[in-house]
Amino acid sequence: MKEDRIVFIFGPTAVGKSNILFHFPKNKAEIINVDSIQVYKEFNIASSKPSKNLMKHIKHHLVDFLDPEKEYTLGIFYEQALRIVKEIRQKKKIPIFVGGTAFYFKHLKDGFPSTPLVTSEIRIYVNNLLYLKGKSYLLKELKNVDPIRFNMLNKNDIYRIKRSLEVYYQTGIPISQFEKKQNSEFKNILIIGLKRSFEDLKTRISIRINEMLNSGLLSEIKGLFSKGYNENTPAFKGIGYNEFLLWKSRPCYSLNDIISLINKNSFLYAKRQMTFFAKISNVLWFHPEDDLVSILNLIFNVDKEI
């Protein structure tokens, strides 16, 4: 392993990313979390944060540190990631990025897009448009001013919809024209993708959701609501949390309805993740269990019996 190399390990939700980390040698690497919800404090169960045992086995960064009311952006993540990589390298360890937020991995590999800042007045204006005219109006407006960005975005990703319009209203230039590839800070990247069949993923997602419920997800959700967290809380955008906003605001939704919706949304998200990851070049794809020895050898150059 060259000293300047970093490692990416990514894959869809429930593929088994955390499980392979228990097999990593102690004190040879540190993990940089690549998950936009696990960064938040208090939002623990549905975000599938690494267990205490796993974090004791191998050090994790960017987990459970951010106030749920704070927005976490690509720019913040990118800046923190650069700093942490330097710190890990100073310890003569391997920086390993692990997670499922494909958008973050893309820009770690390709470089950070140089989009402009926008004023608070523009942000307020776009928020007012959302409040007065609704998401459908924002989508229609985005399609008119930036069809490239419109076709790229998840139509439920209200944060990036707003951000795209903010940049356009601020500059008169579509955000898609700003987001050209920059030079990445990282030149020597080992990219490992984890995959399973969709049938296997669907089963594992269902099992995981049942485990979350048995671990106290409902109590966690009620506790979050009691603290005043709501639909305006950035952490509530995560799957497994966002669906409970319906449960709170619309009594016609039963708990079983919400669980079914979480299952559905989780599987659709896993499919979107795989579609996005498939567009990233130079990925070495492995099954997280069948190919575990190969993964360990590739990263650490060690043989291990499983």
From Swiss-Prot:
Gene3D superfamilies in alphabetical order: 1.10.20.140, P-loop containing nucleotide triphosphate hydrolases
InterPro entries recorded: Dimethylallyltransferase, IPT, P-loop_NTPase
One Pfam family this sequence matches: IPPT
Enzyme class, spelled out: transferase
Single GO MF annotation: tRNA dimethylallyltransferase activity
Known EC number: 2.5.1.75
Gene Ontology BP, a term: tRNA modification
Job of this protein: Catalyzes the transfer of a dimethylallyl group onto the adenine at position 37 in tRNAs that read codons beginning with uridine, leading to the formation of N6-(dimethylallyl)adenosine (i(6)A).
The protein, known as: tRNA dimethylallyltransferase
Species this protein is from: Borrelia garinii subsp. bavariensis (strain ATCC BAA-2496 / DSM 23469 / PBi) (Borreliella bavariensis)
